[in-house]
Regions:
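Amphipathic alpha-helical "stem/stalk" segments
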Residues: 1-77
Length: 77
């Protein structure tokens, strides 16, 4: 999970710096969201989230994404 979240944070940072076009970022973001629709991914995020607290923009992005994924998951069942 840490390795995957590290990759996600790098992708997030590249987009934030304008190094990745928005259309590509949206594809990556959709993929991250799809993974976190699974409850196990959300549980694991809650365990590793503290590791990303020092990178506030990414930490906030992930918390919002995980909340959206949980909400969508709740209505899909």
């Amino acid at each position: 999970m840490i390795q995957y979240c590290n990759l996600c944070s790098e992708e997030f940072a590249l987009h934030a710096r304008g190094r990745v076009p928005t259309d590509i970022w949206r594809i990556w973001e959709d993929g991250i969201f799809e993974n976190f629709e699974a409850p196990i991914w959300r549980e694991l995020w809650s365990e590793v989230a503290k590791e990303y607290r020092s990178y506030e923009p990414f930490w906030q992005f992930m918390n919002e994404l995980v909340a959206r994924a949980a909400n969508k998951s709740q209505f899909d069942t």
